[in-house]
Curated annotation (Swiss-Prot):
Keyword hit for Metal-binding: no
Gene: pyrE
Family of this protein: Belongs to the purine/pyrimidine phosphoribosyltransferase family. PyrE subfamily.
Gene Ontology BP annotations: 'de novo' UMP biosynthetic process; pyrimidine nucleobase biosynthetic process
HAMAP family the UniProt entry points to: PyrE
Cofactor requirement: Mg(2+)
Protein name stated in the entry: Orotate phosphoribosyltransferase
Biological source species: Synechococcus sp. (strain CC9902)
Length: 194
């Protein structure tokens, strides 16, 4: 099992265990994409816990492009991720801002799609995601950022469900980096339940 840069093998195993026990469920589920699945992954119980967010943020930070000035993601799943990675960056003496992409423009005031300290147009931003299935949520965030004049080349996700998201990212000229694949987490969960 390869080690995610930024995490020791022990830390990676700890994060995998947390995801397998607190984020992963097996049953019959309807996903955000509308697809039916026997696997469900909700990373919020892990990303909203102190140690879980620290592990995720450390791993994600190691994949953020060196020239990136900010991390961004679609609310709600990416909210703790962008904050956690920005803080991890600061602790590592790396200045990164956090941006939240709304699902719809703000209905009052400025009508903003983006929240946070906005960098200059043309700046490189890395998109963070909790779970990628078809890539729709990530692409919505990427499209809003690109329309605002930012450059986005990479999406980092905690879990790739391996259901077409990587191909969708590739078609949008994006590199998808996943900390874990669903097949890894489901196999680990099965081992724990034996």
């Amino acid at each position: 099992m390869p080690t995610s840069p930024g995490l020791t093998e022990e830390q990676r195993s700890d994060l995998m265990r947390r995801l397998a026990t607190s984020a992963y469920k097996r049953g019959n589920f309807t996903l955000a994409s509308g697809r039916q699945s026997e696997h469900y992954v909700n990373c919020k119980p892990v990303s909203l816990s102190g140690t879980g967010l620290l592990l995720i943020s450390t791993a994600m930070l190691s994949h953020v492009e060196d020239q990136s000035v900010a991390v961004a993601g679609l609310t709600l799943g990416a909210d703790p991720l962008v904050s956690g990675v920005a803080v991890a960056g600061s602790l590592a003496h790396r200045d990164l801002d956090a941006l939240i992409v709304r699902k719809a423009a703000k209905g009052h005031g400025t009508g903003a799609w983006l929240e946070g300290p906005l960098p200059q147009p043309g700046a490189l931003i890395t998109v963070l995601e909790d779970v990628v299935t078809t890539g729709g949520s990530s692409l919505k965030a990427v499209n809003q950022l690109r329309e605002a004049g930012y450059v986005v080349n990479r999406v980092i996700t905690i879990v790739d469900r391996e259901e077409g998201g990587a191909a969708a990212m590739d078609a949008a000229e994006l590199e998808l980096i996943s900390l874990f694949r669903l097949s890894e987490i489901s196999a680990f969960a099965a081992e724990l339940n034996q």
